[in-house]
């Protein structure tokens, strides 16, 4: 499981950073890629990666500001060319209005897609659990921005315990079909009458990963709720230390406020993104150092960077 950042800039593209988009790679888990936001130029960024557009099965939009959605029409159209014979349908989750934006853009431009898009829109009254599969659950909660904006909490369900193969061999279980039965939780009886209780040879279920991905926001209690015990928290840091008033006036956060959220939530790692173009390389280093005084495991991400979860 990996996060790859396609755009880490704030508001508008710069030479160093494109506007907002990232993907959660779940190839080993479910052979899918989930995208979060799709700012202008996202499809160009994808060309610099190994991501296959047809593997992107779900897109989660945090809010309807242009730097988070203007890349959708182009990406959706290009995806139809690249899918070839393996047409894969797509689901888009986001605030009310995202369906109208996408369909209007496609209609006005005369674009026709060979795959189906299922829209899942929500407002302030329909948040909470927005998706559940056999392996993942996704929650959305309202943040505090200048327009309706949400953050997402992706929870992987507990993983099956692992089989202790060495222990099985020690008690005389031959490698082969019997191993498979025990792994599937089935008790077996050996030829000599020895009964093997499967539960004795399988470790306890392992907790799944938790990933919190927030849209644009001031510091708010919802951010903490979404990030509780998260393995990774992705939080915006449009402003730096000392710019709290500016951040509040414009509906954003500072690096220090993001660090406070991570600390209060008990998150394991903090990844700062949505970085203003006014921050140069030396400023980014200082931004990380300042935030680490509040929350140690912090990193400022850059475009195309991939982070293992």
UniProtKB/Swiss-Prot annotation:
The keyword DNA-binding does not apply. Zinc phosphodiesterase, which displays some tRNA 3'-processing endonuclease activity. Probably involved in tRNA maturation, by removing a 3'-trailer from precursor tRNA. PANTHER family: ZINC PHOSPHODIESTERASE ELAC PROTEIN 1 (PTHR46018:SF2). Its EC number is 3.1.26.11. It holds the Pfam family Lactamase_B. Homodimer. Belongs to the RNase Z family. It comes from Streptococcus sanguinis (strain SK36). The active site is at 67 (proton acceptor). This is Ribonuclease Z. Keywords: Endonuclease, Hydrolase, Metal-binding, Nuclease, tRNA processing, Zinc. Zn(2+) 2 binds at residues 67-68, 216, 274. Binds 2 Zn(2+) ions. Its cofactor is Zn(2+). Zn(2+) 1 binds at residues 63, 65, 145, 216. GO terms for molecular function: 3'-tRNA processing endoribonuclease activity; zinc ion binding.
